[in-house]
Amino acid sequence: MVVNKTTAVLYLIALSLSGFIHTFLRAEERGIYDDVFTADELHHYRINERGGRTGSLAVSGALLSSPCTLVSNEVPLSLRPENHSASRGAPLMLRLAGCGDGGALQPGKRGVAMTVSGSLVTGPGSGSALLPDRKLSGCDHLVIHDGDTFLLCRPDRRQEEMLAAWRKRATQEGEYSDARSNPAMLRLSIKYE
C-alpha cells in the first residue's frame, strides 16, 4: 500500500497537534504554586471549615504584622503588696485588641483561644535602668473571653522595686515627654504558638 506524501504529512501534523493539545490541557497539574500564609485567624478558620487545609498551623520566623495591638500605650502600675506572694509582685494587665473575635470564633466556649509567651523588655541602648539582660518578666497566656482580651505579666519583687524607683524618678524628672529617647521605657515582646 502506497501512502501519498501529502497524506503522511497531514497525519504527522495531526499527531503533533494532538500531542501539544494534550500537553497544554494537562499543564495545570504540572504548575507549582506557592502556598502563602496570611497572618489572619479568620482566614485560616474559614479555610478549615470549607474542608481545605486542616491540621495544626505551624508558623516560624518573625511575623511582619502582629494580629494584636495594645489598647493603650499607658499601663497602670499597681505596686500594692497585699494579696501577692513574697516572690511575685502585682500583675501588670495589658489590654489587647485585634487578637480575634473571642466567642464569635468558638460559640459557647470560654477559655484560651490563642496561646502566647512573651515578656516586657526595656528599650534599646546599653544604659538600661531596669535590667541588664533586658527581660523584665514572663507573661502568662493570652486569654480571650468573648472578645475581652488581656495578657498578664508578673514581675518578681526585685523587678517591681526597680519599676517603682524608675516611676518615681521619671515623674520627678519629667521623662514621660519623649518615650523614644528614654531607654527605660517598656516594650512588649510576644511569641505566637
Curated annotation (Swiss-Prot):
Keywords: Chaperone, Periplasm, Signal. GO terms for cellular component: periplasmic space. It comes from the Bacteria. It is found in: Periplasm. Residues 1-27 form the signal peptide. It holds the Pfam family PapJ. This protein maintains pilus integrity and thus is an important participant in pilus assembly. It may function as molecular chaperone directly or indirectly in the correct assembly of PapA subunits. This is Protein PrsJ. It comes from Escherichia coli.
